């Protein structure tokens, strides 16, 4: 289920103070958070960026192997994005496009990789639930918070990504929108 929330993704706090929040965003496979919402993730969660960049560099021989996967990273308690007194945020890097800029993939390819990345995230969250308390709805759906992924620098019409996200009925997806 998708719920639209007007406001800043980075002010989100879980309903239970002991629960972990999941913040997801679409990423390239080249280790760059240099534009769009990724730059805000970089400022808020520098420890997660380092892990992401290092992970991408270990796949530098063929970064496209990361497409359709998700890297789920626990941020550091010292990251500025954890200032709201909440539990540590987990950053989900959805590898939806190999490159960025003019070399980004087509909207159809990005949508297909989003579907695969979300399936991978869903699997990882099921495992993580066995070890940690993750923010969930009263119906038991894990809450995933995100901006309108792919709609910025990857230039995918939102309706295409929205159709993909609507397939994940077992997840409660908060999509943050800013005017």
UniProtKB/Swiss-Prot annotation:
Residue intervals of the Macro domain: 1-179
SUPFAM superfamilies registered for this protein in UniProt: Macro domain-like
GO terms for biological process, alphabetical: peptidyl-glutamate ADP-deribosylation
GO function terms (MF aspect): ADP-ribosyl-[dinitrogen reductase] hydrolase activity; phosphoprotein phosphatase activity
Swiss-Prot/TrEMBL keywords: Hydrolase, Protein phosphatase
Superkingdom of source: Eukaryota
InterPro entries reported for this sequence: ADP-ribose_metab_enzymes, Macro_dom, Macro_dom-like
A Pfam family: Macro
Binding site for substrate: 7-9, 26-28, 33-38, 149-155
Reactions it catalyzes: ADP-alpha-D-ribose 1''-phosphate + H2O = ADP-D-ribose + phosphate
SMART domains in the record: A1pp
EC number: 3.1.3.84
UniProt xrefs under Gene3D superfamilies: Leucine Aminopeptidase, subunit E, domain 1
Family, as annotated: Belongs to the POA1 family.
Known function: Highly specific phosphatase involved in the metabolism of ADP-ribose 1''-phosphate (Appr1p) which is produced as a consequence of tRNA splicing.
Protein name, per record: ADP-ribose 1''-phosphate phosphatase
Species annotation: Debaryomyces hansenii (strain ATCC 36239 / CBS 767 / BCRC 21394 / JCM 1990 / NBRC 0083 / IGC 2968) (Yeast)
